[in-house]
Regions:
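N-terminal mitochondrial targeting presequence
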Residues: 1-25
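Phosphate-rich ligand and nucleic-acid binding surfaces
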Residues: 61, 105, 216-226, 237, ...
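Short amphipathic alpha-helical segments that mediate assembly, nucleic-acid/protein binding
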Residues: 3, 7, 27, 228, ...
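TRNA-binding/sensing appendages of the translation machinery
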Residues: 20-130, 138, 166, 181, ...
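Positively charged, Gly/Ser-enriched RNA/tRNA-binding surfaces
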Residues: 34, 66-85, 95-98, 128-140, ...
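Acidic, His- and aromatic-enriched active-site or binding-groove loops in soluble protein domains
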Residues: 109-119, 223-246, 337-338
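Generic recognition of cysteine residues
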Residues: 6, 14-16, 171, 188, ...
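Glycine-rich, mobile lid/loop segments that gate access to catalytic sites or pores
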Residues: 206-217
Length: 492
């Protein structure tokens, strides 16, 4: 009814304003009426009913089960980072837009812009690498081994079933500083192997390539210098699109000569190990390109170090790997789960010139790093758990303090204090007189391994009952030795 009334009023107002004899005062009065109608419509019940309560596109909430899985994954990855001597930092969730632009190639269009009343032009961070480079330049840091886990934002078309979102966590490890060739790069590959192996994701492979080698290939094929980066962005799509589609984009959208595109196709189809390095060295046309020589020498050394680090079985030299971000300057790599459709679960490479873009004196700090795609990893693990019918514990409670009779809640609380003081994770029911079956059922449903059961008779004798929840085996222990006995049981 409100909308019908408003519509009639709008028609009346329009007739009045259309009149050739309308005065300024009448116009002001009718405008005031329209504003009042707008306010009424905004507060109307119909408008509220049409509001759909949901999260924005490309985002999601996380349940306790999902958060438990997430924290478990991050804990394992952080342990790997710390094992390799990394320290952690944090940076703002948004940056000056100028800091981010010109660093991501064609993906710059995916940056979220912000409006700021203070006059600064801002944007949500697209990744953690560019803010890290900005941090190094601002702080005058020339060497650091750091990890950073935080949310980033991309205005992408998400596919949440495949672990792709607009808001998601990145998990980065980077080594900054002037060091001997390929030593930090090889360690980054070792870190990827350790991390993915610790998570039991199944079989995976790490594809590696070198930006200098790619540039040498483009030059040998006849790609104009000013098209190197845009053609590189096309090659980067080969992990998602067949060669025919990529070739079509090169020729039709980027006006690359068909013969040149075909030459590129003959190279990017190659993959192998150190034997591929030797095969490419026999390519006379390619070896005339200094960039190609430089890239092959680096790849040979990297593969040697991979052998020493015992990761050769996980690494494949793949000429189709491009990684479209503009800031990469050397080795690049990407990890893929072989029996999953989620795409890459880790990627990175060397970016020696990024810090210099922010330094007033253009002083570069060589960097190499890896970003582990934890959102996609969560997606893989959630699917694994669902297919196996598994259940995730959402708490770390070790002991539940239960009572078998009424009016024992004070003693339950005293026992809890003793356990908490001993740094044992414990809880009780928040009812004064809970039923014993309900308490034990709570333990079983939540995976709590041990229950302490108290009763009037046992307390009078100075003992309590310890119950192993899984086996339902019970034994009595002295009340004054309870904490000691619980610690002993948990230790075993």
């Amino acid at each position: 009814m409100l909308r019908v009334k408003c519509l009639n009023n709008i028609i009346t107002t329009c007739k009045c304003l259309y009149s050739s004899t309308v005065t300024v005062q009448q116009i002001n009065e009718e405008v005031a009426k329209l504003l009042e109608l707008k306010a009424q419509l905004g507060d109307g019940g119909d408008a509220q009913q049409k509001f759909i309560l949901k999260t924005p596109k490309g985002t999601r909430d996380y349940s306790p089960e999902q958060m438990a899985l997430r924290l478990g994954v991050l804990d394992k990855i952080i342990n790997v980072f710390k094992r390799h001597g990394a320290e952690t930092i944090d940076t703002p969730i948004f940056e000056l837009k100028e800091v981010l632009t010109g660093k991501y190639g064609e993906d710059t269009k995916l940056i979220y812009d912000l409006k700021d009343q203070g006059g600064e032009i801002l944007a949500l961070r697209y990744d953690l690498t560019v803010p890290f480079a900005r941090y190094l330049a601002m702080s005058k840091i020339t060497n650091i081994k750091r990890y950073h886990i935080a949310k980033v934002y991309r205005r992408d078309n998400p596919s949440m079933t495949k672990g792709r979102y607009r808001e998601f966590y990145q998990c980065d490890f980077d080594i900054a500083g002037i060091y001997d060739s390929m030593l930090p790069d090889a360690e980054c590959l070792r870190i990827v192997v350790e991390s993915l192996s610790a998570l039991n994701l199944g079989a995976f492979v790490i594809k590696v390539n070198h930006r200098s080698l790619l540039d040498g290939i483009f030059a040998a094929c006849g790609v104009p210098n000013d098209k190197f980066r845009t053609i590189c962005s096309s090659v980067d799509k080969l992990d998602k699109s067949p060669w025919e589609e990529v070739r079509k984009e090169m020729v039709e959208e980027k006006q690359l000569d068909e013969a040149i595109a075909d030459k590129i196709g003959s190279y990017v189809s190659k993959r192998g190990d150190v034997k591929l390095v030797n095969e490419l060295r026999e390519d006379e046309i390619l070896m005339k390109q200094p960039k190609a020589k430089e890239g092959l020498e680096a790849m040979e050394l990297l593969l040697k170090y991979c052998d020493i680090y015992r990761v050769t079985d996980k690494v494949v030299f793949d000429l189709s790997l491009a990684r479209g971000l503009d800031y990469y300057t050397g080795v690049i790599y990407e990890a893929v789960i072989t029996d999953s459709e989620v795409g890459s679960v880790a990627g990175g490479g060397r970016y020696d010139n990024l810090v210099g873009m922010f330094d007033p004196k253009k002083k570069n700090v060589p960097c190499v790093g890896v970003s582990i795609g934890v959102e996609r990893i969560f997606s893989v693990l959630e699917n694994q758990i669902a297919s196996q019918g598994g259940k995730i514990r959402t708490t770390e409670v070790q002991v539940f303090v239960a009572s078998a009779q009424k009016n024992l809640h004070d003693e339950r609380m005293r026992i809890l204090v003793d356990l908490w003081d001993a740094e044992i994770k414990a809880e009780q029911s928040y009812k004064k007189n809970p039923k014993i079956l309900a308490q034990l059922q709570h333990c079983e449903e939540n995976g709590i391994p041990l229950a302490i059961i108290i009763g009037e008779g046992e307390l009078a004798k100075g003992v309590v009952t310890l119950r192993e929840v899984n086996t339902r085996v019970e034994r009595t222990v002295p009340r004054d030795k309870l904490v000691e006995e619980v610690k002993k049981w948990l230790g075993n």
